[in-house]
Design a protein with these regions (language model features):
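Non-catalytic signal-transmission and effector/linker regions of two-component phosphorelay proteins
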Residues: 1-23, 38, 50, 74-81, ...
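Short helix-loop-beta junction
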Residues: 22-30
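Residue preferences within the helical output face of two-component receiver
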Residues: 40, 66, 98-100
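Short beta-strand/turn micro-motifs composed of small residues
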Residues: 10-12, 86-89
Length: 126
């Protein structure tokens, strides 16, 4: 992949879907994958991704937040050009809506991911 290709940051904490890297690369993205939000934030401070694709999980026992993504989304807000795509379980849509009321999320797709839907979103953003 060309070094000047736009960076897509894939944040995978749940591993609940197939490897999407080949799709991202076919669409012309340079891909960085992190398996922890804190490592993704560290990478975002070094490089500015064009797109962030992150999985969302809701845990009712979180006292001070809705999900795993608050810190990541707060960091992403500083880069107005970055597009944020969240992958989520349909049963957690209510929690995702709470998160959307506080942070910009450009698109959200339910799991299991349908590659044609993901491809359509990412193609539109290129």
């Amino acid at each position: 992949m060309a070094e000047n290709a736009p960076l897509l940051l894939s944040v995978i904490e749940l591993l609940g879907y197939p490897n999407l890297r080949p799709l991202y690369e076919r669409l012309g993205y340079r891909v960085a994958t992190e398996f922890a939000v804190r490592k993704a934030i560290s990478l975002m401070r070094k490089e500015k991704p064009a797109v962030i694709v992150a999985d969302f999980y809701f845990q009712p026992d979180f006292r001070d937040r809705v999900s795993n993504l608050e810190s990541l989304l707060a960091t992403a807000q500083a880069n107005k050009a970055v597009k944020v795509l969240v992958l989520f379980e349909s049963s957690h849509e209510h929690a995702l809506e709470r998160l959307r009321s506080r942070f910009r999320i450009d698109a959200a797709l339910t799991l299991p991911v349908r590659e044609n839907e993901l491809e359509a979103v990412l193609t539109d953003w290129r």
